[in-house]
Amino acid sequence: MTNRTCLAVILAAGEGTRMKSTLPKVLHKIGGLEMVGHVMNAASSAGADALALVVGNGAEQVRAFAEKQTADRRDIFVQEERLGTAHAVLAAREAMSRGYDDVLVVFGDHPLLDPSVLLSAREKLAEGAAVAVLGFRPPVPTGYGRLIEKEGRLVAIREEKDCSEEERKITFCNSGVMAIAGKHALALIDQVKNENAKGEYYLTDIVEIANRQGLLVVASEAGRESAVGINNRAELAEAEAVWQQKRRRELMLSGVTLIAPETVFLSYDTQIGPDTVIEPNVWFGPGVRIASGAHIHAFSHIEEAVVETGATVGPFARLRPGAQVQEKAKIGNFCEIKNARIEPGAKVPHLSYIGDATVGAGANIGAGTITCNYDGFLKHHTEIGAGAFIGTNSALVAPVTIGAGAYVASGSVLTEDVPADALAFGRARQATYEGRGKVLRDKLAEEKAKKSGG
């Protein structure tokens, strides 16, 4: 297919009223990516040189999302009136008129669309078809338009209400997705009339129009997941489950161990190397890369972070955006790391917050250590040198530097830099008063008794 040019027209103008949301339907997410983003990726993977998004409801929000996505060529067209699918496709007339070998028509609410089925439809065009319609076989075909075939040709798409008793027995159904030969696309769609009860222009009419002109029209079969759109929150959750199950399997087959795969939740761009172990109940947000041989313990939450080879994270750890856990470093239980580099072999084992910081190679951060990075207006950096030892329950008030090999005594609050190999105390000297504990206890007990008696 490399020598055939292709335009994908993505219909994303639907109202999406059944989602009951102020957010446009196509911007609801599967695996951390907007549904229309999945469709754009599928079209690009199927060889589309250019994308034309037709937007309507929430046009500015959809436009803002689409413009952030990478594409060799991406155009956005607004469908001002909702007059049917053929009318929607013609909103992208400018893009179609540039002259592509293949034109794909897909929907922005089909997040599970597999690039392979689009490639299969394009292959039909390469073999001489003018139109290739994507069909599927649902367990119960009720409600779907039927694909009527005769001697290997698709002769009509019949809505169920218009089907004969014999046609209702057909289980091959219309998904709405089409591939159209570019040289015929505009001519065919321009002939669609709105002579129906709703007064709309239906793209499916081009099947019969093409047949009347003696052009070859065929059907290409896809799995149900690729063919079904999302209309409400329940279907969104079902699609999420299907997507997650598929992605988990791909990771396991690539050499990643998921101890309880059904409890691990991934994002569209999650990267995990072989020989990494993921324990139960781990959540990956967008922007995560885990190298080979890492170990992510249970109940960890990771987003926009990098974990390098041999590092361990968790249990109950949170890596926020900008966290870098380098080779053989350790992030232990109930730790939060944000915009910080934990260098090779460094340890943050328990109950710590490390934000806007660098922790040098081999450094050890005691339990309860906090980098105080925010003064109410700005974030400030904490630098902890290689091999430094930070005692438990210490507060490092940024901006501050702890030199390589330095020791910080437990319970310290440090506001000044500590030189390399120095020992720093940032707490008041302990004072002990013999017998005063009993005096205080007796006094407080007497006051309590007076209040109780009153």
Curated annotation (Swiss-Prot):
Protein name per the record: Bifunctional protein GlmU
Region described as Pyrophosphorylase: 1-233
Gene3D superfamilies recorded: Hexapeptide repeat proteins, Spore Coat Polysaccharide Biosynthesis Protein SpsA, Chain A
Cellular component terms per the entry's GO annotation: cytoplasm; membrane
Keyword Repeat appears in the UniProt entry: yes
Entry's cofactor comment: Binds 1 Mg(2+) ion per subunit.
Cofactor: Mg(2+)
Active site, UniProt feature: H350 (proton acceptor)
Quaternary structure and partners: Homotrimer.
Organism lineage: Bacteria, Pseudomonadati, Pseudomonadota, Alphaproteobacteria, Hyphomicrobiales
Enzyme class label: transferase
The protein's role, per its UniProt record: Catalyzes the last two sequential reactions in the de novo biosynthetic pathway for UDP-N-acetylglucosamine (UDP-GlcNAc). The C-terminal domain catalyzes the transfer of acetyl group from acetyl coenzyme A to glucosamine-1-phosphate (GlcN-1-P) to produce N-acetylglucosamine-1-phosphate (GlcNAc-1-P), which is converted into UDP-GlcNAc by the transfer of uridine 5-monophosphate (from uridine 5-triphosphate), a reaction catalyzed by the N-terminal domain.
Family in the record: In the N-terminal section; belongs to the N-acetylglucosamine-1-phosphate uridyltransferase family.
Reaction equation(s) it catalyzes: alpha-D-glucosamine 1-phosphate + acetyl-CoA = N-acetyl-alpha-D-glucosamine 1-phosphate + CoA + H(+); N-acetyl-alpha-D-glucosamine 1-phosphate + UTP + H(+) = UDP-N-acetyl-alpha-D-glucosamine + diphosphate
UniProt-listed NCBIfam families: glmU, PRK14353.1
UniProt pathway: Nucleotide-sugar biosynthesis; UDP-N-acetyl-alpha-D-glucosamine biosynthesis; N-acetyl-alpha-D-glucosamine 1-phosphate from alpha-D-glucosamine 6-phosphate (route II): step 2/2; Nucleotide-sugar biosynthesis; UDP-N-acetyl-alpha-D-glucosamine biosynthesis; UDP-N-acetyl-alpha-D-glucosamine from N-acetyl-alpha-D-glucosamine 1-phosphate: step 1/1; Bacterial outer membrane biogenesis; LPS lipid A biosynthesis
Annotated region (Linker), positions in chain: 234-254
Residues involved in UDP-N-acetyl-alpha-D-glucosamine binding: 11-14, 25, 79, 84-85, 145, 159, 174, 231, 320, 338, 353, 364
Organism, scientific name: Chelativorans sp. (strain BNC1)
Annotated spans, N-acetyltransferase: 255-454
GO molecular function list: glucosamine-1-phosphate N-acetyltransferase activity; magnesium ion binding; UDP-N-acetylglucosamine diphosphorylase activity
Any one GO BP annotation for this protein: regulation of cell shape
Binding site for acetyl-CoA: A367, N373, Y374, S410, R427
